[in-house]
């Protein structure tokens, strides 16, 4: 089983994915938790580049760094895990490229789809959980997290984008989910971590 978690910065993806990992592991599933960028050795190097607030990356450079990370990540981690019958939970995946670079940066979504297909070799998740939350609340969460962990410089580039960018990302995720209703389920993330976890389990029980 391959499940991805998507959403804007500060939507609660990491907390949820850790809860889901614990839950499905306790039910006897062989679970792998991974993320993009940074789910493989190359990805760890690329993550420091693409998320740093100190580098003036162009939109095109940003895109191809994400795609390079994804191609290596799929080949090294996701595809082997799926072939070995493991349950894979991934924090961000190909949908993030469609939304951030397409709806956010204004790139051609058709082209982004084609680039993604090369990187992922046709491996799409069985289910994607989209965590939807008010932009201001989510950014407040993200900024508090980054401040507490000392990540403002090394991983704060997207959080420092203007509010209009984040609104485009939220709207883009919702629009993209509407175009892929069978795979993407929208969850209300403006709630407690426990409620969000219960929402997620209810959805995933239908495909396990």
Swiss-Prot record:
Q: Where are the transmembrane segments?
A: none
Q: Which UniProt keywords apply?
A: ATP-binding, Kinase, Nucleotide biosynthesis, Nucleotide-binding, Transferase
Q: State any GO CC term.
A: cytosol
SUPFAM superfamilies reported in the protein's UniProt record: P-loop containing nucleoside triphosphate hydrolases
Under Gene Ontology molecular function, one entry of this record is: dTMP kinase activity
Name the source's superkingdom.
Answer: Bacteria
| Record carries keyword Metal-binding | no
Q: What is its EC number?
A: 2.7.4.9
Record GO biological process: dTDP biosynthetic process; dTTP biosynthetic process; dUDP biosynthetic process
Which reactions is this enzyme annotated as catalysing? dTMP + ATP = dTDP + ADP
Q: Where does the chain bind ATP?
A: 7-14
Q: Which NCBIfam families match?
A: DTMP_kinase
As for family, the record states: Belongs to the thymidylate kinase family.
Q: What does this protein do?
A: Phosphorylation of dTMP to form dTDP in both de novo and salvage pathways of dTTP synthesis.
Descriptive protein name: Thymidylate kinase
Question: Which organism's genome codes for this protein?
Answer: Lawsonia intracellularis (strain PHE/MN1-00)
